[in-house]
């Protein structure tokens, strides 16, 4: 719904929005400029990458996570419904390659002050939080922030890391 001071103003507003949605032009440094379709493409575009964020249906996540780990990246895996057998295998790959796998089903991380997933803007400080529960980690981080204590890292590992089967 567009509300404007007249039909001409409304039409102009709609035209601007439509142009923005269909434009192939990008400005250097914008999010639209960097949208790799694969792990390999992302690394070709920027070989300094260290973390891959994976958010696909759980059925497809293991393939992408494994590609990222085998490419030397740490992984933030937002995807849920990843079969537990795949999660165990991926955790083993991460350990053997000395990479960090956050998730699957990891909703929150703050790495060197950069939020991934659902995260709050926090003052920087000396505290690091590692938790299975992203909601719990955010609550602790926000309480620390409100108390004037900054947080440098918040790492969610995913809820199944605490189970005997995965942990």
Question: What do these predicted ranges mean?
Answer:
Residues 1-167:
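Catalytic-core regions of core metabolic enzymes
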């Amino acid at each position: 719904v567009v509300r404007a001071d007249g039909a001409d103003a409304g039409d102009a507003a709609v035209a601007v929005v439509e142009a923005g949605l269909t434009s192939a032009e990008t400005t250097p440094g914008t999010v639209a400029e960097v949208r790799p379709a694969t792990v390999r493409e992302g690394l070709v575009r920027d070989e300094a990458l260290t973390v891959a964020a994976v958010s696909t249906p759980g059925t497809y996540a293991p393939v992408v996570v494994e590609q990222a780990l085998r490419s030397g990246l740490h992984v933030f895996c937002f995807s849920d419904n990843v079969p537990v057998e795949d999660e165990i295998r991926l955790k083993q790959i991460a350990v053997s390659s000395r990479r960090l796998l956050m998730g699957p089903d990891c909703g929150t991380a703050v790495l060197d002050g950069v939020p991934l997933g659902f995260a709050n803007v926090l003052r920087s400080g000396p505290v690091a939080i590692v938790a299975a529960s992203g909601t719990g980690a955010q609550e602790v981080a926000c309480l620390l922030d409100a108390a004037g204590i900054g947080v440098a890292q918040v790492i969610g590992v995913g809820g199944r890391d605490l189970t005997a089967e995965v942990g």
